C-alpha cells in the first residue's frame, strides 16, 4: 500500500471507467514510469514508444494492456493488476487517464504526460465510442465493483436516443468537468468535455518544471517520431542513438500499430471493442472542421480562453511549435 502518500493529499476522480483510489494498492518502485493523458490524446502511442525503449525492440512479453495496464480502470480486479505489476522484473510503465493532481507523486517515478489538440481528441473519442461495446463494459464493471459503488445505468431519457455529432460536440464544448474533481462515482455522458481535457492538461502545466515530469505532444510525434523517441529516451535515462531511435520508431507508426492491434490496442483481452483495428482509426488532425460551423469555431475560442491560460492553449493545440513547455 502507498501509506506514504495518503489519499487526502490527492484529488479523487471516480467514474464508470476509472477510480484513482486503486493507486493505493500499488507499491511504487524506483524507476517506475507513469504515462498520463486525456482520452484519445496519444497515450497508447506513448506506451508503444516506451515499450520499444524498455524492451529495446518491438517484441512484447504479452498484450500491451497487460504489460502496461490502465491501473485505475475498474473492469479488472485491482488485486490481479497489482500482482501482475509486482511480478514484473523489467522497468515498469503504467497507464492512467487520471489528472496529475489525482496521482501519487513520487520523486523516484517519471511522469510522462501527453497532450493533443482537444478538437482532434474529441473527434477520435466520437469514433471510439461507436467502436466500444458498452454492455460488455458494464458487465466487466459490475463484476469488479461492489454493488453500493456501481454506476447506475444512464437516465431512461438517454436510452435509445441517438445523438448527432453536432449535439455531442456542443455538449463537449459547453460542459463542465465530468465528474467534478473530488466527488463520488458519476455516470459520464457522451464523449466527455473540453473542460475535462484542459483541466487535466492544466494539472500538468503547473507542474511541468518538476524534474521528473515531462510533456510530449501528439503533433510533435507526427512531425518527428524518431526525434521524439530519442527525447523520450533521454528523459527516461535510457541509452539510444539517433540511428537506433529511427530504427525503433518504424514500429510505432500508425500502420505498424494497426497491423498488431491485438497486441497494441488497449483491453484487447477484455472484448470491449467491436474491432481492435478500428482503435487505430486514422490518427490524423483537422477532422474536427467538418463538425464546426464558423459560429461554433468562434465559440470554441471564447470557451478555451475561459478555461486555460494562453501559453497552455498554445502548447495544447500545436505542441512545442506553439509553445515550448521548457519556458
UniProtKB/Swiss-Prot annotation:
Residue positions of the active site: 97
Enzyme class label: transferase
Presence of the UniProt keyword DNA repair in the record: no
Keywords assigned: Transferase
Signal sequence interval, chain numbering: none
Enzyme Commission number(s): 2.8.2.-
InterPro entries recorded: P-loop_NTPase, Sulfotransferase_dom
Highest taxon, organism lineage: Bacteria
SUPFAM superfamilies the record matches: P-loop containing nucleoside triphosphate hydrolases
Record-level Gene Ontology MF annotations: sulfotransferase activity
Positions bound to 3'-phosphoadenylyl sulfate: 40-45, 116-124
Pfam families: Sulfotransfer_1
PANTHER family noted in UniProt: SULFOTRANSFERASE SULT
Family listed: Belongs to the sulfotransferase 1 family.
Role description: Involved in the synthesis of cell wall sulfolipids.
Name of protein: Glycolipid sulfotransferase BCG_1434
Lineage: Bacteria, Bacillati, Actinomycetota, Actinomycetes, Mycobacteriales
Amino acid at each position: 500500500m502507498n501509506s506514504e502518500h495518503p489519499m487526502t493529499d490527492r484529488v479523487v476522480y471516480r467514474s464508470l471507467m476509472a477510480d484513482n483510489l486503486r493507486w493505493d494498492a500499488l507499491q511504487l518502485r524506483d524507476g517506475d514510469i507513469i504515462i498520463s493523458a486525456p482520452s484519445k490524446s496519444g497515450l497508447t502511442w506513448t506506451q508503444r514508444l516506451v515499450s520499444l525503449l524498455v524492451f529495446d525492440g518491438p517484441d512484447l512479453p504479452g498484450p500491451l494492456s497487460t504489460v502496461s495496464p490502465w491501473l485505475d480502470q475498474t473492469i479488472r480486479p485491482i488485486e490481479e493488476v497489482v500482482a501482475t505489476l509486482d511480478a514484473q522484473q523489467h522497468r515498469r510503465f503504467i497507464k492512467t487517464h487520471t489528472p496529475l493532481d489525482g496521482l501519487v507523486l513520487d520523486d523516484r517515478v517519471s511522469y510522462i504526460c501527453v497532450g493533443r489538440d482537444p478538437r482532434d481528441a474529441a473527434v477520435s473519442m466520437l469514433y471510439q465510442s461507436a467502436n466500444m461495446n458498452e454492455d460488455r463494459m458494464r458487465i466487466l464493471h459490475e463484476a469488479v465493483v461492489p454493488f453500493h459503488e456501481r454506476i447506475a445505468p444512464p437516465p431512461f431519457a438517454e436510452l435509445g436516443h441517438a445523438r448527432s455529432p453536432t449535439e455531442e460536440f456542443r455538449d463537449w464544448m459547453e460542459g463542465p468537468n465530468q465528474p467534478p474533481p473530488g466527488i463520488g462515482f458519476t455516470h459520464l455522458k457522451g464523449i466527455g468535455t473540453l473542460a475535462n481535457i484542459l483541466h487535466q492538461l492544466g494539472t500538468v502545466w503547473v507542474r511541468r518544471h518538476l524534474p521528473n515530469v515531462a510533456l510530449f505532444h501528439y503533433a510533435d510525434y507526427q512531425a518527428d517520431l524518431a526525434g521524439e523517441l530519442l527525447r523520450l529516451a533521454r528523459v527516461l535515462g535510457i541509452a539510444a542513438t539517433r540511428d537506433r531511435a529511427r530504427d525503433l520508431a518504424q514500429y510505432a507508426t500508425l500502420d505498424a500499430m494497426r497491423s498488431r492491434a491485438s497486441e497494441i490496442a488497449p483491453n484487447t483481452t477484455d472484448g470491449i471493442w467491436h474491432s481492435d483495428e478500428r482503435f487505430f482509426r486514422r490518427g490524423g488532425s483537422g477532422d474536427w472542421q467538418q463538425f464546426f460551423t464558423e459560429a461554433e469555431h468562434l465559440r470554441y475560442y471564447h470557451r478555451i480562453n475561459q478555461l486555460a491560460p494562453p501559453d497552455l492553449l498554445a502548447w495544447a493545440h500545436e505542441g512545442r511549435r506553439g509553445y515550448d513547455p521548457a519556458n
